[in-house]
Every structure is written in C-alpha cells, then in structure tokens.
C-alpha cells in the first residue's frame, strides 16, 4: 500500500522543518516545497532568500525527503503586492500576510502541490483543522500565544479540506526542543518577523520606493496646525513613533498618536494621550468578507473578535451592514481599530472568518470626515 503524499511548505525556519519531520515520522510520503514569493532587489542585507533555501536543503537532507523550489513571485506581485500598494495609496493599512495565505500559500501552492500528486499540504502555522459533520472548521492553536488563525481566516472549505497543521497541538517551546533533539541545523534560527517581502529593512524606506510622498498638514481635532506629514500612506492609526512631534511642548505633554486621515484634504489628525476618545471605537464596519463555513453568522450573534494579531478576543455582536459587509458592536471600547486591517470573528476556539475593516466609529463630535462606509454602519444600527 502506497503512502499518502503530503507536500510541506518549507521556509527554512524551525516550524516548517519540524512539521516536515513530524509527518515523515508518522509515515507520510513527504515532499518539501520552498516558495520564492519575492524577487530580491538589493544586496542581500535584508532579504534572506538564499540562506533560507540553503537551510531548507540542509533540513531535507537530514530528515531524508525530497525538496524543490518554486517561484511564485509573479503571482505574489499580481495578487498580493498590487493590493498592498492600492490600500496604502488609499490611506489604509493592509495586512498582506492574510492575503498571501489565501492567494499564494493555500491557492497557488496548493495547486502546485496537487500537480505533484499530493493528497494534502501542510505548513508550520499554529492553528488546527477539525472535520465535523462533513464540514471543516478552523480552530485556534493550543498554544494561544502563537495562534495564527487570525492570518488564516480567509481559508475556505476546499482549502481546509486539503490542509494539515501538525503544530496546532504543540507548544512552541516543544517545537524548539524537538528541533534540538533531532539535530536540525536551523534549531536556533530566529523566527521571522515583519512583512515577508520587506524583511528587516526600514518600512518607510521600502514604501517610499513605490509610493510618492505628498506632504500635508498635521492637525489636532480642534484644527490647530502642529506640523507637516510626509504623506498619509506613511502613517497608521494609533502610530506613536515617527510622527515628528516627540519634542513638542504644546498641549498636555502626553505622547502624540495618529488618530485619523482625511484623504480629501490630505490632512493627518493627531491627538495626545493613549486613551484619547478619537482612538477608541465601539463599532466598526468591515467589507470584503470571507467565511470559513461559506456563510455568515446569524444576525445578532454574540461572538469574540480580533482587530489585530495577538489581541485578546473582544466581546461583540454581529450584524449585517448591507451588501457583503458586516458591523460589530463591542461591549468595551477598542483601541486604534485600523481601516485596512482584518476584523476576525471567533466562537470560542472556532475561527468563523472575517473581513477588512472599512470604518471604525468613535462617536466623537468634530471627527475628521468619515469614509464611505459610515452610512453602512448607520444602516446596521
């Protein structure tokens, strides 16, 4: 009887390496696949693709599996990076890792794996898949400190049915122990951080390569001019560092935070104090939705939601907001809910799916002009 073939997405990191070893130990016919999703465009100071590939080959040799490299740079540029630039140009703060998972790692990669005769794919993500009553559920990892279901919430039934997450029930500390015990050459390699195609290079420098600077006024909620910004695309809601007002003695003396953007007038609004009302929201509208089960929760469903990675689930109530949109009403005010980021819903351990945040209502008089999503929020009330 032939072994079931599983293709493992291998990045050169510890997690995907241990994933491949675990599946080999369980008797699968394991093939490693290294994805190159970005063409290096500098001297290698920030990009680690070459070293990552060397690590993948070394691990594959040690555990005794075949490995190949595939270039998805063109697909990544068309499906992920182009959207990344569009969102930043519109003044929002996108999360390309969410789109990369849906469009590249679990679409382009999945299709390629199937062409290699795989029955399933596996990655080193910290999450779980459970089949129940003929449906597939996306669950949080047992190690909640490493849970990555937030980034995977756009996966659908077809994708989950062919996906394995072997690390979903293993603490990260145990993964490191396994790597050391079996002698993986990358056992002590640091976890990757930041956006995959930016690496460790300064984010503003990278963005400036693709988006022009367009300076404009920086104002307080009452209209007082306190400085000049270099371009709305280079700032995000709740940002504290890099505003250029650290030494300002105006106002309360508290730190300054980015609070709003007015695209029409090219104005950046800033406030003082972490808990300023302009930074707190009890309601949001999200669009571009995706539901793991293929359909949204029931109207008025009480659930938990994350508006950023590693945030504790916030109690809220779900409502439809017209078209392919939904609104969330939170029990407690949420800090710096950022347009462009994902609002992801949970029913306990189960990730239901989510959407892209379009608008977060602070309910404060004199707020900067609201975007087009504001009427949808009013409609949902």
From Swiss-Prot:
Residues at the site labelled Interaction with tRNA: 125, 341
Subcellular location, principal: cytoplasm
GO CC annotations on file: cytoplasm
Any one Gene Ontology molecular-function term assigned to this protein's record: tRNA binding
GO biological process: tRNA wobble position uridine thiolation
Uppermost EC category: transferase
UniProt-recorded name of the protein: tRNA-specific 2-thiouridylase MnmA
Organism name: Burkholderia multivorans (strain ATCC 17616 / 249)
Source taxonomy: Bacteria, Pseudomonadati, Pseudomonadota, Betaproteobacteria, Burkholderiales
């Amino acid at each position: 009887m032939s072994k079931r073939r599983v293709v493992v997405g291998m990045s050169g990191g510890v997690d995907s390496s241990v994933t491949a070893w675990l599946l080999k130990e369980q008797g699968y016919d394991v093939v490693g696949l290294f994805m190159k999703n970005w063409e290096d465009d500098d001297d290698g100071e920030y990009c680690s693709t070459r070293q990552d590939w060397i690590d993948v080959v070394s691990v594959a040799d040690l555990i005794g599996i075949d490995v190949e490299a595939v270039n998805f740079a063109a697909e990544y540029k068309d499906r992920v990076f182009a959207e990344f630039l569009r969102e930043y140009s519109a003044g929002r703060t996108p999360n390309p890792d969410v789109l990369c998972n849906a469009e590249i790692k679990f679409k382009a990669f999945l299709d390629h794996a199937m062409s290699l005769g795989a029955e399933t794919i596996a990655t080193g993500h910290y999450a779980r898949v459970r089949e129940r009553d003929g449906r597939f559920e996306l669950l949080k990892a047992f190690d909640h400190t490493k849970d990555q279901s937030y980034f995977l919430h756009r996966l659908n039934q077809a994708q989950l049915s062919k996906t394995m997450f072997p690390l979903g029930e293993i603490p990260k500390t145990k993964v490191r122990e396994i790597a050391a015990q079996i002698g993986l050459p990358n056992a002590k390699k640091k976890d990757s951080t930041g956006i995959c195609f930016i690496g460790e290079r300064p984010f503003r420098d990278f963005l400036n390569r693709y988006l022009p600077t367009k300076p404009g006024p920086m104002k307080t909620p009452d209209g007082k001019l306190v400085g000049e910004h270099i371009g709305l695309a280079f700032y995000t809601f709740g940002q504290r560092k890099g505003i250029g007002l650290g030494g300002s003695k105006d106002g309360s003396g508290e730190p300054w935070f980015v609070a709003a953007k007015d695209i029409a007038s090219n104005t950046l609004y800033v406030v003082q104090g972490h808990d300023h009302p302009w930074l707190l929201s009890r309601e949001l509208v999200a669009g571009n939705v995706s539901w793991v089960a293929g359909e949204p929760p029931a109207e008025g469903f009480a659930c938990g939601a994350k508006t950023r990675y590693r945030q504790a689930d916030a109690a809220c109530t779900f409502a439809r907001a017209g078209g392919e949109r939904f609104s969330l009403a939170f029990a407690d005010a949420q800090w710096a809910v950022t347009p462009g980021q994902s609002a992801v819903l949970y029913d306990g351990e189960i990730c239901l799916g989510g959407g892209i945040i379009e608008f977060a209502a602070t309910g404060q008089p004199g707020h900067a002009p609201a975007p087009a999503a504001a009427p949808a929020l009013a409609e949902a009330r």
